[in-house]
Amino acid sequence: MKSIVIFGSGIAGLSAAHELVQLGYTVSVYEAIDQPGGFFRSSRLGKDNMPSEYSWHGMGPWYHNAFDVMQQIPFNEKGSIYDLALSRPVDFGIFPHTDKAQFYDEGLKSIPKMFRMNTWEFIKWFYVMLKTWTSNNRSKIDYDKLNAAQAWKPFLKDKAYKTWRSCFGPWIGSDWSKVSLHTTGAFFKKQLTTKAIHRHKADQNGPAWTQGTGAGWLLFAGPSSEYWFNPWVTYLKEKGVRFCFEKALTKLDFDGTTITSAYCGEEIIQGDIYILAINPFIAADILSETPALESQEELKLFKPLVQGGPHIQVSFRLAFSEELKFPRKRTALVISDSEFNLTLFAEEQVWDKEVDLGRNIKSLWTGTSCISSVPGRIYHKPVNNCSKEEFVEEVKAQILSCGALDELIKEANHGRGLKEFSLLKIEVWHEWKFSPEGIKSLQPKWVNSTNTQAYLPAQKTPVPNLYLAGAHTRTQAEVWSIEGAVESGRRAAKAIDDRVEVLDQYRPFWISSLSKIDDILYTIKAPQFIDSIVLFLIIFSLWFTYLIVSSL
């Protein structure tokens, strides 16, 4: 069988290796740093052994390929990652500073309360959402150039508008100042309409259960590297995959037809087939070293794909010396009025009891600052220009200002508010380098934003032995996510060997049908399908009114 060289041991690279080694290929994986997992990895670097992570991520009911892969990876001798390493669904709530926290307790009926909308605002909110769901080409071309927050702004009052946009970073993963209407619509379409039935076995937390359409998201029952990537790499090594860490790709040799070799510094790497599963910023730099390669179809998309620059979402941990309880199980938070658009989760709510939180730590909250361009309340600086100390003080102040959070803490802790608990420290993911000139990460992160859809490359390139993987490539997931990464790795593997199975995203018949109608309307430059229906009803009403008046 042919030899496969994969650059990158993030989720996409590991997914491609997983599929190809099982089909008999000789697979080698090269990784720039000393551990796998990419932007989802965890680590324990401090003397207190406290776990840290790049950012916390959930897994939704439409993560079909991700869950399928997890079912194939042994966690231990008792079962798979899917069976033993996943939590039950988290309970995500919107936590404003002055109002009560609101949760998704009643399905779609909960949305007006969660986002502080009145009935008329909710109707207009759904009108915009429905337009994204019933568009195909129009959404990919036109709506991708529209900022989602700005698209909804004319239809919502200020309070509802700011509350609604606050969920974009924590849920979609792309901050509200940059995420497109297309990406936002695609995300909620899958979440609320996917045909999902992911069955889970009974465990210490209760009987067997099902994660269905619209259900809450799952987390790992421990740090991501310890509960996914380490077992996965162990499994792949047993299957024959060779891993080479701290080997960064620096150059690809191209003879005008194929890739003849690759370089990690001075070391020459050779194989029959190469898969680039590295972040697109680094890929763009490597391709620029070889203009003849950079100009190839699909590969020439990288430069415009990364033109918007890296995404800044800074993760942090709050370590407490006492256990803080919540009145609801597995409570996840969006601090909706925080300037830095903070999201939080207390890890001990879902982590196995044997997981070490760190020396003297009884409660460990993981959080993410989801927008970097809005000035904070203390220093009046955005995350982009804060020092590390200023960032930590801002995060602390914004969390302590959240009245909804403090109310729930008091409810579950005998009247004690958040300020009354001893905070040992606030830790920030170690790769972030703060500077007045601008915050930077050792590994720049890409996410979907306005005007990126047109530049997503396919997994198969015109170079017959070069393939691409990563959530920045074209997938049915359509969102930079764990599912998008797994799907892309599988699609890259399938482009090499058609025996690889990729699970498709479900599209309801009514959405598929109406989207096809809108494609016709878009071709003839007619209004969007929903707009056309509304316009027709208005004209019909006027005509009917005219007939009635004329007959009098």
Report the location of each language-model feature:
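N-terminal Rossmann-like FAD-binding beta1-loop-alpha1 element of flavoenzymes
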Residues: 2-29
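Conserved Rossmann-like nucleotide-cofactor binding loop
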Residues: 12, 35, 281
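Glycine-rich FAD pyrophosphate-binding loop
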Residues: 21-44
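Dinucleotide-binding Rossmann-like beta1-alpha1 core, especially the glycine-rich loop
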Residues: 47-138
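Active-site/ligand-binding neighborhood in enzyme catalytic cores
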Residues: 128-251, 255
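Conserved beta-strand-loop-beta-strand element in the redox core of flavoprotein oxidoreductases
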Residues: 251-269
